[in-house]
From Swiss-Prot:
Subcellular location: Secreted
InterPro entries, alphabetized: C-type_lectin-like (IPR001304), C-type_lectin-like/link_sf (IPR016186), C-type_lectin/snaclec_domain (IPR050111), C-type_lectin_CS (IPR018378), CTDL_fold (IPR016187)
Secreted keyword on record: yes
Name of this chain's protein: Snaclec jerdonuxin subunit beta
Length: 148
């Protein structure tokens, strides 16, 4: 009987791992997870170009944060406001990367928008996710994101 239970459990583990059920994903220590992506708030202030380079150095595939839903925005706001209070964070959106079309610095489509203005580099307010244009050389906080 014990052997039957052991074999049955082993088959269940193999089935679940092959089917992807319960297979989940893990973010590195200090990173938050949402919808198979990992996020981290950094308290350093940098200009947009240095911030994007910084994110790329933090983890393979990491870039400045991109938003694709209001739920994703809610998660990032819940992580940034307690740490940064009333301030701004760079988003991975600027004309530096693509003069003709708007896309995130990670190459994904700009499919969620909350514009308040337009310029070369875009920030998000930590309190209400209002998007604002800022001079790319100004120094702002950083949120990095990568797909797990």
């Amino acid at each position: 009987m014990v052997r039957f239970i052991f074999v049955s459990f082993g088959l269940l583990v193999v089935f679940l791992s092959l089917s992807g059920i319960g297979a989940g994903f893990c973010c590195p220590w200090g990173w938050s997870s949402y919808d198979e992506h990992c996020y981290q708030v950094f308290q350093q202030k940098m200009n947009w170009e240095d911030a994007e380079k910084f994110c790329i150095q933090q983890h393979k595939g990491s870039h400045l944060v991109s938003f694709h839903s209001s739920e994703e925005v809610d998660l990032v706001t819940s992580k940034t406001f307690p740490i940064l209070k009333h301030d701004f964070v760079w988003m991975g959106l600027s004309n530096v990367w693509n003069e003709c079309t708007r896309e995130w610095s990670d190459g994904t489509k700009l499919d969620y928008k909350a514009w308040s203005g337009q310029s070369d580099c875009i920030v998000s307010k930590t309190t209400d996710n209002q998007w604002l244009s800022m001079d790319c050389s100004s120094k702002r906080y950083i949120v990095c994101k990568f797909q797990a």
